[in-house]
Structures are given as C-alpha cells and as structure tokens.
C-alpha cells in the first residue's frame, strides 16, 4: 500500500490487515452431535454451538491418544474457532470439556439416551441455521439429565416434545392426533405436567417406545427431515 505524506512516498505493509480479514478466531461453546472422520488424523465435528447454531467444524491432528471421550454424544465443549472467508468449513482447536457429565457417562441408560437425542438433533437441525435459544435449552436439558438419579426413563419423550416447541411448532390436538392416535391422552399429560411429574407418568417399555417413534414422525413431518434414527433400536431394546 502506498500513500503520500507531505510530498513523500510512505510504504505501509497491509499483509497483516489482509490476513485478519481472511481469518478471525472466536472462542465458543459447543455441544457435540456427531463426528465424521476426515483424512488420516482429522475430524469434522458436527455441533450445536452457542455462537453459530448448528455448525460443523474441522479439527486437525486427532490421534488415538487425543481423548476421543471429548466427542461422545452431547458432550459440552469449549474451543477456538478460526473463521475463514475462503471456506464455509471453519477450523477449531483448543477443545476442552466444560462439564464432566459423570452422571451420564457412568450410566449405560443415560449414555444410550444421549446417543439417541444427539442423533435426532443432528438430523433435524439444519446445518448453518441459528435457532434462537436452542443452545441454552439443550445445555439445560443435558445438565438436567446428568443430575437426575432416578426416574428418567421418560426423559427422551419430554425432550422430543420440548424440541418441537423450540423449533416453533407447539404440539396441539389437531395436528398431533394423526401421529399419536390413542396415545394422545398420555402425550397431553407430558405437555401439561411440570417436568418432575412428567418423569413419573407410568409407562411400560412398549408404550414408551411407540410414543417416541410417533413424536419422531411428527417432528419429521414438520421439519421436512428424513429422521432415520439408527440409535432408536438400541434405545428401544434398553428400555423394553
């Protein structure tokens, strides 16, 4: 860059400012939804992030000793995102856990539930879309599941119904009935009861699984998503 100062030619380097325009780093909070292997030692981490909404990031230099436990479903992380004007796939580094979630990780039932819920959100939330309040709501529910010690078998049903509300379509009788049929009175209980009481609604495994599948079809219809949840079978067997 050249400018004239009192008749003299002054040369100012713009390399640094140009670099800043191309790359900018931000610290953000993340919730892990899914990961995809990329090359020999990199991962694409699909997340729900506080700053960017539903977004995928490239993490380089991931080895077997890098602590893959960081990428378990619904893990709460914090990391530095480098934005680039040259690519829509931003890179991320410096990932650290924000909460150990020991109440979840020490329970096969809760781990299976988080695997299911993370997969639902991975498939339903659209890449690059920011849903106001979605991150905060999801984080609150993860910490709630982590803290509950008993009576959480109904948690995923409550989560799915609240997810529908967060997405902007509150379940009502007229449009919910075709999906849940005879189970509507039970679903109505879940929508009207406080959280703690909804966890105590008596359901056998078969009915609980049927309701979960029905609500998934309802969400699928309203989001125009192909919600083919692989982990549903595992959840169904575990809570049979």
List where the protein language model places each region.
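N-terminal amphipathic/basic-hydrophobic helices that include classical n-h-c signal peptides
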Residues: 1-23
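Non-catalytic alpha-helical scaffolds and adjoining flexible linkers that form interface surfaces
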Residues: 19-43, 48-240
């Amino acid at each position: 860059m050249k400018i004239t100062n009192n008749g003299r030619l002054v040369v100012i380097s713009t390399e640094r400012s140009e670099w800043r325009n191309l790359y900018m780093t931000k610290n953000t909070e993340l919730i892990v939804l899914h990961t995809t292997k990329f090359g020999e030692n990199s991962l694409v981490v699909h997340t729900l992030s506080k700053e960017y909404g539903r977004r995928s990031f490239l993490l380089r230099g991931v080895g077997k000793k890098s602590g893959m436990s960081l990428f378990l479903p619904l893990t709460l992380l914090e990391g530095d995102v480098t934005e680039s004007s040259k690519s829509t796939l931003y890179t991320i580094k410096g990932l650290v856990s924000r909460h150990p979630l020991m109440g979840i990780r020490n329970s096969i039932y809760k781990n299976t539930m988080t695997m299911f819920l993370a997969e639902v959100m991975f498939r339903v939330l659209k890449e690059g879309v920011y849903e106001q309040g979605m991150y905060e709501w999801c984080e609150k529910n993860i910490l709630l599941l982590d803290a509950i010690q008993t009576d959480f078998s109904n948690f995923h049903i409550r989560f799915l119904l609240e997810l529908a509300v967060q997405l902007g379509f509150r379940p009502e009788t007229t449009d919910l009935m075709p999906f849940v049929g005879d189970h509507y009175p039970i679903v109505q209980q879940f929508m009207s009861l406080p959280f703690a009481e909804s966890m105590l609604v008596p359901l056998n495994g078969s009915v609980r699984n049927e309701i979960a599948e029905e609500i998934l079809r309802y969400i699928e219809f309203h989001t125009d998503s192909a919600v083919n949840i692989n982990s549903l079978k595992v959840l169904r067997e575990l809570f049979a």
